[in-house]
């Protein structure tokens, strides 16, 4: 499974949404119904899954599915 698909599975599982709703511009809060705690838990899940630390200042900039895919692809080169 590629990284993008795994990211989408984590989001779908945590937020209880269908993977096909996870377009790159889908916003976690506005489009996918996440609250601030959900977003924190998502960041923690990405950190655990990909064995990476995401600083708070970076996490605050991650607002969409595309943001997290681009961020992780950049950090995990």
UniProtKB/Swiss-Prot annotation:
It is found in: Cytoplasm. One of its GO terms (biological process) is lipid A biosynthetic process. One of its GO terms (molecular function) is acyl carrier activity. 4'-phosphopantetheine is transferred from CoA to a specific serine of apo-ACP by AcpS. This modification is essential for activity because fatty acids are bound in thioester linkage to the sulfhydryl of the prosthetic group. Residues 1-76 form the Carrier domain. It comes from the Bacteria. Its main location: cytoplasm. GO terms for cellular component: cytosol; membrane. Pathway: Lipid metabolism; fatty acid biosynthesis. Gene3D superfamilies: ACP-like (1.10.1200.10). InterPro entries: ACP (IPR003231), ACP-like_sf (IPR036736), PP-bd_ACP (IPR009081), Ppantetheine_attach_site (IPR006162). Keywords: Cytoplasm, Fatty acid biosynthesis, Fatty acid metabolism, Lipid biosynthesis, Lipid metabolism, Phosphopantetheine, Phosphoprotein. The modification O-(pantetheine 4'-phosphoryl)serine is found at residue 36. Belongs to the acyl carrier protein (ACP) family. Carrier of the growing fatty acid chain in fatty acid biosynthesis. This is Acyl carrier protein. It comes from Hydrogenobaculum sp. (strain Y04AAS1). The gene is acpP.
